[in-house]
């Protein structure tokens, strides 16, 4: 309640009721969620930032609302409506036109002060696939090994040693679920298929309160939800392994899937070695080591009725 004292009287007023606007911020082309998109109501100045699932929420007083959303690399979007009850509105942003490369050089005298996320690195999937890798096999963990304060030990291994810590001092999460065994083939491959990864957030210090149980670092890996508009697929063949990825809508603009599989053919490399060894050995040795894995994800947006 809101009250006001006038002489000997206390006048009570009912506090104006407020309503909540919530929804998801998505890419209009692929319908994937946009993380850390800005949503602002222009007249009041109140705003919010979308979370890891693209969800936002703002509480406002009833009346005319001008809701604006923006995200790096996308055209801003605005919606005007009358707020009379709790409302759910999804905002779709269109990718902005890409201009030619422009190089801007400058020196910030207080760059260390302006950056509030000390010890945090965001690694998108495009960066993982663009960096050179041993024998052409791209990998999230090997990309993190190139960051300052991180070493990977032996060349080709997928472990992380952050700021002098041990390999067991790191917390790996896949869509919020802990991953305890993070490598294959004695550490030559990590357990994260690059075709399934959307982005990875790497914390070297000042961990958020939601993470715990580790001393050195936290690696939060998020996987692709899949394209809700059209079907896409790709096949990649390397020296040591082959990968395939397929994504697309189950119900258009409502649900999607993303499936990624990979398999190595290291037995083709070890077979000549085993043949040479068996010619000189009394006992026949057999070696056909390989591995395969699969990542599958289904994303569905529920409504008030389903």
Language-model features: locations:
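A glycine-anchored, Pro-Gly-centered beta-turn/N-cap motif
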Residues: 61-63
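A short tyrosine-centered beta-strand micro-motif
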Residues: 65-67
């Amino acid at each position: 309640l809101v009250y006001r004292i006038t002489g000997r009287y206390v006048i009570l007023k009912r506090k104006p009721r407020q309503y909540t606007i919530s929804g998801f911020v998505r890419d209009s082309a692929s319908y994937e969620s946009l993380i850390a998109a800005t949503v602002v109501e222009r007249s009041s100045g109140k705003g919010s930032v979308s979370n890891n699932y693209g969800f936002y929420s703002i509480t406002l007083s009833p009346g005319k609302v001008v809701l604006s959303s923006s995200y790096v690399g996308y055209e801003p979007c605005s919606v005007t409506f009358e707020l009379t009850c709790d409302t759910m509105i999804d905002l779709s942003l269109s990718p902005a036109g890409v201009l030619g490369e422009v190089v801007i050089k400058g020196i910030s005298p207080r760059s260390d002060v302006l950056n509030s996320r000390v010890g945090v690195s965001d690694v998108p999937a495009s960066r993982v696939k663009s960096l050179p890798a041993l024998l052409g096999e791209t990998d999230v963990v090997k990309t993190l090994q190139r960051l300052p304060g991180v070493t990977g030990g032996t060349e080709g291994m997928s472990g992380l040693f952050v700021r002098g810590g041990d390999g067991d001092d790191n917390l790996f999460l896949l869509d919020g679920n802990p991953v305890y065994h993070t490598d294959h083939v004695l550490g030559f491959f990590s357990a994260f298929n690059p075709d399934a990864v959307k982005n990875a957030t790497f914390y070297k210090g000042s961990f958020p309160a939601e993470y715990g149980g580790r001393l050195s670092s936290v690696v939060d890996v998020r996987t692709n939800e899949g394209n809700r508009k059209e079907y896409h697929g790709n096949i990649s063949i390397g020296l040591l392994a082959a990968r395939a990825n397929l994504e697309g809508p189950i119900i258009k603009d409502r649900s999607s899937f993303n499936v990624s599989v990979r398999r190595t053919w290291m037995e083709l490399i070890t077979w000549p070695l085993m043949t040479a060894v068996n010619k000189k050995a009394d006992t026949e040795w057999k070696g056909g080591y390989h591995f395969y894995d699969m990542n599958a994800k289904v994303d569905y947006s529920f409504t008030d009725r389903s």
